[in-house]
Amino acid sequence: SRGTFFNARTYLNHLNPEYLRYYFASRLTNTIEDIDLNLSDFQARVNSDLVGKIINIGSRCARFINKDFGNELASELNNNKLHDNIIENKNEIIKNYEDRKYSANIRLITSLADEVNKYLDEEKPWVQIKDDNNRGYVQKVCTDGLNMFKVLAGYLKPIIPDCVDKIEKISIL
């Protein structure tokens, strides 16, 4: 222990317990070792990785689907290759959970989220939507993003089940 102490009730009065679950999962391996709660690292992992990289995918894409397409997803994907790559990691993620390699899963899921964010950054739906001729394309790109977001969220369900339950209840997903 390095002087980091807080009362569990105090934490629960101010923060979602799933943030702590996510943080601990990002630090847990299948070995027996102490985990130091570093509040700066905690804040960075939750804000940057969980919210900034993963949750933001859903937020970025849902905004377009909701506002510009009346909550209607495209009938087909634009980037099947990236979607298939996300799905192909399922067995490795399951195995990591079975082997209690939680931090390995967080790294893998975060790297997959990085790929999705890179795709969205390259396709620039916020620019493409300005041209009416690109509306169908933007709908497909955002459908890609939401589908991949839902898969990534599913991969995190053992760690943040309440958050994922809320995501699964969103009608456009």
Please place each PLM-identified region on the residue numbering:
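Catalytic adenosine-cofactor/nucleotide-binding cores of aminoacyl-tRNA synthetases and other
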Residues: S1-L77
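N-terminal alpha-helical segment
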Residues: T4, I35, N85-K90, M148
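Generic detector of short, locally flexible boundary/turn motifs and exposed helical patches
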Residues: P17-R21, K81-L82, K130-D132
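Helix-rich, typically C-terminal accessory recognition domains appended to large enzymatic cores
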Residues: F42-L77, K90-L173
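Membrane-interface interhelical connector segments
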Residues: N78-I86
